[in-house]
UniProtKB/Swiss-Prot annotation:
One of its GO terms (biological process) is rRNA processing. The N-terminal region is required for binding to phosphorylated substrates while the C-terminal region binds to the other R2TP complex components. Its main location: nucleus. The gene is PIH1D1. The modification Phosphoserine is found at residue 173. This is PIH1 domain-containing protein 1. Belongs to the PIH1 family. Residues 34-53 are annotated as: Disordered. The keyword Ribonucleoprotein does not apply.
Length: 290
């Protein structure tokens, strides 16, 4: 999940602790003000037209099932990990790696023999799809996750055996899909970006201490203690309507927590405070708690 593009240029070394704190306070004020514009600042969903990739054939108790593995540049990519890094992550924490994908609605089609069947369209990021085409491991991983996702979403029980159709990139027609317009909050650096390499933990990622409080009726604040880090480089953060997920570089930290409030994830902001070694997150609320 780590994404260095989430970082912004550091502040000048001459800035003091008070200036850093003031910067974060301004950040929180800005997050609170932007709550008023949340409903008009960005559409809740975006319509995409997935491009064909390849098609796999399997079956369920109801008959033949075809899954069109498609791609779109509008789908966010997963973490840019090597296969060795991914294998190690999956061995240590299977929930620590996610492949963003859009699962389309079932549509009735006819197979090559003119018999009725059901097809599903599953879209992943286009750049990741091209990488997957050159890796049997990634391709099988995507197919496994796509099958499990369809089973969970639609209550299916698919045959674990499947095969990729030759010379047929898709079955039927690929429909447009609506994906949620959600952006990860950028992690701002409060201090310099010098980050010495951190040792890889031997016992898996550590769950950091989290503090939550309401700064205002419409603003929830979070402080995540990260004493092993000196900067935001390698940190990733995902905020959903009632969930906060954070990953640390080299699997030093992992946090996945439920928040019983409706969060405006599109307007959430984050900053790493170097002197305190804390990740601070400002989360405007969609509905004010009573």
């Amino acid at each position: 999940m780590a994404d260095s593009k989430m970082l912004v240029p550091e502040l000048n070394d001459a800035e003091t602790m008070g200036a850093e704190t003031s910067r974060f306070e301004e950040l929180l004020l800005q997050a609170s003000k932007e709550l008023q514009q949340a409903q008009t600042s960005r559409p809740e969903s975006t319509q995409i037209q997935p491009q064909p990739g390849f098609c796999i054939k399997t079956n369920s108790a109801e008959g033949k099932v075809f899954i069109n593995i498609c791609h779109s540049p509008s789908i966010p990519p997963p973490a840019d990990l090597t296969e060795d890094e991914l294998l190690q992550m999956l061995e240590e924490d299977q929930a620590g790696f996610r492949i963003p994908m859009s699962l389309g609605e079932p549509h009735a089609e006819l197979d090559a023999k003119g018999q009725g069947c059901t097809a599903y369209d599953v879209a992943v990021n286009s750049d990741f799809f091209r990488r997957m085409q050159n890796s049997d491991f990634l391709r099988e991983l995507v197919i496994t996750i796509a099958r499990e996702g369809l089973e969970d979403k639609y209550g299916l029980q698919l045959n674990p055996e499947w095969r990729i159709l030759k010379n047929r990139p898709f079955l039927g027609s690929i429909s447009q899909q609506n994906i949620r317009s959600q952006q990860r909050p950028r992690i701002q650096e409060l201090g310099n970006l010098h980050t010495p390499s951190s040792p890889r933990p031997e016992a898996g990622p550590e769950k950091p201490h989290l503090s939550l409080w309401l700064e205002a009726p419409d603003l929830l604040l979070a402080e995540i203690d990260l004493p092993k880090l000196d900067g935001a480089l390698g940190l990733s953060l995902e905020v959903g309507e009632n969930r906060l997920v954070m990953g640390g570089p080299q699997q030093l930290y992992h946090l996945d927590t439920y928040i019983p409030l409706r969060i405006n994830c599109d307007e959430s902001k984050a900053a790493f405070h170097q002197k305190r070694k804390q990740l601070m997150v400002a989360m405007p609320l969609l509905s004010v708690p009573s």
